[in-house]
């Protein structure tokens, strides 16, 4: 079993440009973490909605995208290729993320990123689909398999301004529909 951090603020990641992203700097802001893939059927929808949320709450929300290849190999780009894939292929049209993308990682299994080990421990299943599991067991390419595993691309985790994981959302929950929960956490009028 992977090491599980004691606090959200003990975690970190490495951005696509190689810089350390220290979660301790997120104190006082809500954080939305989403495992992403540039070749998924909902890539365009989810990436544009992530940009929209980041733009709506520029100083009070941090959005982090974690590219992952564990679901249908739908993030088969290397780290240095991901931004060009998003810009020219999907969503395309010159798309540029307004949020931070970190280096490609695993979200399940023996080599899962510590961020996902922590989040899955605190939020073991999506609130909107507590029975969410991988729909086709032949697609599972990691071990060990756990009930709390991320089921597919674009699962989301919302963390409150005090660093407490608040809610986990399934792959089918539209990213933009998280806005009322973000407002609630930030005490913004809905």
From Swiss-Prot:
The record's InterPro entries line, in alphabetical order, gives: Glutathione_peroxidase, GPX_AS, Thioredoxin-like_sf
The keyword Cytoplasm is annotated on this UniProt entry: yes
Q: How does it assemble?
A: Homotetramer.
State its Enzyme Commission number(s). Answer: 1.11.1.9, 1.11.1.12
Superkingdom, taxonomy of origin: Eukaryota
Task: Kindly identify the residues recorded as the active site.
Answer: 40
Which named protein is this?
A: Glutathione peroxidase 2
Catalytic activity of the protein: 2 glutathione + H2O2 = glutathione disulfide + 2 H2O; a hydroperoxy polyunsaturated fatty acid + 2 glutathione = a hydroxy polyunsaturated fatty acid + glutathione disulfide + H2O; tert-butyl hydroperoxide + 2 glutathione = tert-butanol + glutathione disulfide + H2O; cumene hydroperoxide + 2 glutathione = 2-phenylpropan-2-ol + glutathione disulfide + H2O
For this chain, the family text in UniProt reads: Belongs to the glutathione peroxidase family.
Location relative to the cell:
Cytoplasm, Cytosol
A GO term for molecular function: phospholipid-hydroperoxide glutathione peroxidase activity
A GO biological process this protein is involved in? response to oxidative stress
PROSITE patterns reported in the protein's UniProt record: GLUTATHIONE_PEROXID_1, GLUTATHIONE_PEROXID_3
SUPFAM superfamilies (UniProt xref): Thioredoxin-like
- Report the function annotation for this chain: Catalyzes the reduction of hydroperoxides in a glutathione-dependent manner thus regulating cellular redox homeostasis. Can reduce small soluble hydroperoxides such as H2O2, cumene hydroperoxide and tert-butyl hydroperoxide, as well as several fatty acid-derived hydroperoxides. Cannot reduce phosphatidycholine hydroperoxide.
Q: According to its UniProt record, where is this protein mainly located?
A: cytoplasm
**Pfam families, sorted:** GSHPx (PF00255)
Q: Which GO terms describe its cellular component?
A: cytosol
Xref: Gene3D superfamilies: Glutaredoxin
